[in-house]
Amino acid sequence: MVSTFITVAKTLLVALLFVNINIVVGTATTGKHCSTGPIECCKQVMDSKSPQATELLTKNGLGLGVLAGVKGLVGANCSPITAIGIGSGSQCSGQTVCCQNNNFNGVVAIGCTPINANV
């Protein structure tokens, strides 16, 4: 019974994520924000069609359906960049990006576009 619940929960999560991905369009930046939310700092970025992206999603329990129709990069270990000079989130030692969907608790962000945030 528990395994059935987990399977149903994963299926619903993938369906909701697919809807969110298709609703969000554009990743333009204005100031320190993207049109989709804060600028993110990802420790690693990869092509959404790469074996590394497939492995990252699979390893984190996400189905490949979350990439359906997604253009751009997949980010790994991402966090929002805060205002300059405030906390550890004010600097990025990885790649700064704007992502269409970063609702995976920082583990994965999809539909990312690299930017030069100068932070």
Curated annotation (Swiss-Prot):
Pfam families: Hydrophobin. Residues 1-26 form the signal peptide. InterPro entries: Hydrophobin, Hydrophobin_CS. GO terms for cellular component: extracellular region; fungal-type cell wall. Keywords: Cell wall, Disulfide bond, Secreted, Signal. It is found in: Secreted; Secreted, Cell wall. The keyword Repressor does not apply. GO terms for molecular function: structural constituent of cell wall. Disulfide bonds join 34-98, 41-92, 42-78, 99-112. Induction: The highest level of expressionoccurs early in development when the primordium differentiates into densely packed, randomly oriented cap hyphae and loosely packed, vertically oriented stipe hyphae. In mature mushrooms, transcripts accumulate only in the transitional zone between cap and stipe tissue. Belongs to the fungal hydrophobin family. Self-assembles to form functional amyloid fibrils called rodlets. Self-assembly into fibrillar rodlets occurs spontaneously at hydrophobic:hydrophilic interfaces and the rodlets further associate laterally to form amphipathic monolayers. The production of fibrils decreases at basic pH, while acidic and neutral pH favors the formation of fibrils. Aerial growth, conidiation, and dispersal of filamentous fungi in the environment rely upon a capability of their secreting small amphipathic proteins called hydrophobins (HPBs) with low sequence identity. Class I can self-assemble into an outermost layer of rodlet bundles on aerial cell surfaces, conferring cellular hydrophobicity that supports fungal growth, development and dispersal; whereas Class II form highly ordered films at water-air interfaces through intermolecular interactions but contribute nothing to the rodlet structure. This is Class I hydrophobin B. The gene is hypB.
